[in-house]
Amino acid sequence: MLAKRLVPCLDVKDGKVVKGVQFRNHEIVGDIVPLAARYAEEGADELVFYDITASAHERVVDKSWVSRVAEQIDIPFCVAGGIKTISQARELLAFGADKISINSPALTDPSLISRLQDEFGRQCIVIGIDSFFDASSNSYKVKQFTGDEAATKDTQWFTQDWVEEVQKRGCGEIVLNVMNQDGVRGGYDIKQLSLVRAICDVPLIASGGAGTMAHFRDVFIEAKVDAALAASVFHKAIINIGELKAYLAAEGIAIRR
């Protein structure tokens, strides 16, 4: 069994790490590089950085902090935010990022996935999917431009259909951001993640809902995800990564130590 990964997520806005609840009302958490260094020291397996307003504001993630992060940490990290071209992706990889994640730009132009995969290989192409449960239709749907409340919009895609589409186009990994659970620390959406797991042949990362160590255990065992992403429980020091790894190992889960 491959070891499960623990992935702190750092949402970036105006050069600071922020955190909201259900993708709204973001508050400043701290500075990018010190937080990245702290999580690397605690034992994170990798980091994910989302420049949350880049796509909505028609710009690309700021490369200056990408290079500073690369100088300070020795674990892999992924960056996202407004990446729409091969050249933009190449620059970010050259500045030290190990993976590129695209979300809204892929919804606008799905062929971008294939072009990035052809250029760099699927191992470094991650697709972020912002999924919400629509009670009126009793279905999971994909939203776009979620980093800016004013710009957020519905798309034509049902979540499971989009998961299948991005795999056909060559993504190497999927992060499922469950919007209904985000920031509320009530547990991962096991039901939705299990449905996606059944049709997902690439590594699947759960995002949204972590509040206790048991939530990580449950998502690994019940939804069979490859990695668990979390933000507020790490930012607020509710859970220490090293202690979480010890807990998961004691629960019989293969974890990187």
Curated annotation (Swiss-Prot):
Q: Which portions of this protein are annotated as coiled-coil regions?
A: none
Residue positions of the active site: 11, 130
Q: Which GO terms describe its molecular function?
A: imidazoleglycerol-phosphate synthase activity; lyase activity
| UniProt cross-references to InterPro entries, sorted A to Z | Aldolase_TIM (IPR013785), His_biosynth (IPR006062), HisF (IPR004651), IGPS_HisA/HisF (IPR050064), RibuloseP-bd_barrel (IPR011060)
Protein localization: Cytoplasm
The region annotated as signal peptide is none
Write down the chemical reaction(s) this protein catalyses.
Answer: 5-[(5-phospho-1-deoxy-D-ribulos-1-ylimino)methylamino]-1-(5-phospho-beta-D-ribosyl)imidazole-4-carboxamide + L-glutamine = D-erythro-1-(imidazol-4-yl)glycerol 3-phosphate + 5-amino-1-(5-phospho-beta-D-ribosyl)imidazole-4-carboxamide + L-glutamate + H(+)
Annotated EC: 4.3.2.10
**Which Pfam families does the entry mention?**
His_biosynth
Sorted UniProt keywords: Amino-acid biosynthesis, Cytoplasm, Histidine biosynthesis, Lyase
Q: In which pathway does it act?
A: Amino-acid biosynthesis; L-histidine biosynthesis; L-histidine from 5-phospho-alpha-D-ribose 1-diphosphate: step 5/9
Q: Which GO terms describe its cellular component?
A: cytoplasm
Class of this enzyme: lyase
Query: What GO biological process terms are annotated to this protein in UniProt?
Result: L-histidine biosynthetic process
Q: Describe the subunit structure.
A: Heterodimer of HisH and HisF.
Q: Family per UniProt?
A: Belongs to the HisA/HisF family.
This chain's function reads: IGPS catalyzes the conversion of PRFAR and glutamine to IGP, AICAR and glutamate. The HisF subunit catalyzes the cyclization activity that produces IGP and AICAR from PRFAR using the ammonia provided by the HisH subunit.
Protein's name in the database: Imidazole glycerol phosphate synthase subunit HisF
> Which species?
Shewanella sp. (strain W3-18-1)
